[in-house]
A protein has these predicted regions:
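Sec-dependent N-terminal signal peptides
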Residues: 4-13
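Glycine/tyrosine- and acidic-biased, solvent-exposed loop/turn segments at the edges of beta-strands
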Residues: 16-336
Length: 336
């Protein structure tokens, strides 16, 4: 009987030693090492470290083996609810890791493999509503990721490869209707991109090349009328841009752009298609004579420009070609 009692006491002693609890303040590391010791001791720590709030409540418990995190590490809120729950093996994050809101709801959960995220990560709102689903492989986002709205409907989805967007990325309106779709290649926008009205009708379409706009961007009214054509090169408007009347769909204005600035002849049109006015631009400023026309094609007026300012004599004509008004300007100001 005495031998049995002695054996039990020895086992109890060993277990107590292996699970000794030491205050966080007594722990230390030496030099550049991450190995944890009890201050003044030379043997790496094995046991449980406790960290407490100023009021004495437990803030964290950390399991160590041979000076490295090994087993559960749990942190707490002041109210006693768990804040995070992680698992380590020999100092490396392994297995399921969870973080919680103060009300006890899961904030996110993810699986680690050799310190890297690996598998499906889910995040939630404080009420428990699913917010995101992201797949990881060897620490990088891989495959289809999804974002959800507070009402549970899908807000967006994207494919990833080696941590970068690859393929079609989609966004949705709160009613579930597709809002946009963009193609990606090696993490950069590449190929067709489209934006839709909440009705599902096409609003805009453009083309990207290696992350920058390249090609004609077209914008539409909700009833399908083309209202704008912008030629892009290297993410800047370059070439002949056209603007159309939203009611009739007819050409209203056209101008040439060079690196986002108007350069060259710009023209405006009547709804009938007849020329209304024309003027040259230089570095986005009017330069030369602006000519305005009656719908029958006869000259209605002339306005001289210099460096974007009216400079010279403004002339207005009647439909018979007679000058009916002249006003002199100098550097944008009328000369009296």
């Amino acid at each position: 009987m005495k031998k049995i009692l002695l054996s039990l006491l020895l086992i109890s002693s060993v277990l107590s030693f292996g699970a000794q609890r030491v205050p966080y303040e007594k722990m230390t590391t030496y030099g550049n090492s991450n190995i944890v010791y009890i201050e003044g001791q030379e043997t790496p720590f094995t046991g449980i470290v406790e960290k407490k709030f100023p009021n004495g409540k437990i803030e964290a418990t950390m399991n160590f083996k041979d000076g490295k995190l090994h087993g559960k590490t749990i942190t707490y809120y002041q109210n006693g609810n768990i804040k995070s729950d992680e698992n380590f093996i020999n100092g490396i994050a392994q297995g399921v890791s969870k973080r919680f809101y103060e009300n006890g709801q899961v904030e996110y959960e993810v699986t680690y493999k050799n310190q890297k995220r690996d598998g499906l990560e889910r995040s939630y709102s404080p009420t428990g509503q699913l917010q995101t689903e992201i797949i990881y492989k060897d620490g990088k986002i891989e495959g289809l990721s999804k974002i959800y709205r507070a009402n549970g409907k899908l807000e967006g989805e994207a494919y990833f490869k080696d941590g970068q967007p690859e393929g079609i990325t989609k966004e949705y309106y709160p009613n579930g209707i597709l809002r946009s779709e963009v193609n990606y290649l090696l993490g950069a926008k590449h190929g067709a991109s489209k934006i839709y009205y909440e009705s599902g009708k096409l609003q805009s379409e453009a083309t990207f090349k290696n992350g920058v706009l390249d090609g004609i961007q077209k914008d539409y009214t909700e009833d399908g009328k083309l209202i704008r054509e912008l030629p892009f090169k290297y993410n800047q408007v370059n070439g002949l841009a056209k603007f159309y009347n939203e009611q009739t769909g007819k050409l209203e204005y056209e101008t040439i752009y060079v690196d986002n600035m108007r350069e060259g002849l710009s023209k405006k049109y009547y709804l009938s298609g007849k020329l209304l006015s024309e003027v040259n631009f230089k570095k986005d400023k009017e330069e030369g004579i602006l000519k305005a026309y009656y719908e029958n094609g006869k000259t209605q007026g002339e306005i001289p420009y210099k460096n974007g300012l009216i400079h010279g004599t403004i002339k207005r004509y009647d439909e018979n070609g007679k000058v009916v008004e002249e006003v002199k300007y100098k550097e944008g100001k009328e000369v009296k």
